[in-house]
From Swiss-Prot:
Keywords: Autophagy, Cytoplasmic vesicle, Lipoprotein, Membrane, Protein transport, Transport, Ubl conjugation pathway, Vacuole. The C-terminal 2 residues are removed by ATG4 to expose Gly-116 at the C-terminus. The C-terminal Gly is then amidated with phosphatidylethanolamine by an activating system similar to that for ubiquitin. The record marks G116, D117 as: Cleavage. This is Autophagy-related protein 8. Residues 117-118 form a propeptide. It comes from Aspergillus fumigatus (strain ATCC MYA-4609 / CBS 101355 / FGSC A1100 / Af293). The gene is atg8. GO terms for cellular component: autophagosome membrane; cytoplasmic vesicle; fungal-type vacuole membrane. It is found in: Cytoplasmic vesicle, Autophagosome membrane; Vacuole membrane.
Length: 118
């Protein structure tokens, strides 16, 4: 999936920003979170997050749910490289496995399970 953030910001600028963030906040992970294009779920008010390394994927999903004011009965799925990450996984391990060459971790979210097959 194409990232709007990548389209709007040149690679060198993104890389420099991620490096600056990692130097200043070594215990935090720079995350870009965007809605899957054709999803009917609410659009998030901000794309850029500085996430504690020890946060779990489930805790991050909770943050996203709050930001888009999603009611408890509605489903939300987050994807990293078009795969559903394990809820108990630490954001630091997801970052190490899936960070982009620019230094950001790109996460997409949707109201439906568009990529996974579970």
């Amino acid at each position: 999936m194409r990232s709007k953030f990548k389209d709007e910001h040149p690679f060198e600028k993104r890389k420099a920003e991620a490096e600056r963030i990692r130097q200043k906040y070594a215990d935090r992970i720079p995350v870009i979170c965007e809605k899957v294009e054709k999803s009917d779920i609410a659009t998030i008010d901000k794309k850029k997050y500085l996430v504690p390394a020890d946060l779990t994927v489930g805790q991050f999903v909770y943050v996203i749910r709050k930001r888009i004011k999603l009611s408890p009965e509605k489903a939300i799925f987050i994807f990293v490289d078009e795969v559903l990450p394990p809820t108990a996984a630490l954001m630091s391990s997801i970052y190490e496995e899936h960070k982009d060459e620019d230094g950001f971790l790109y996460i997409t979210y949707s109201g439906e399970n568009t990529f996974g097959d579970c």
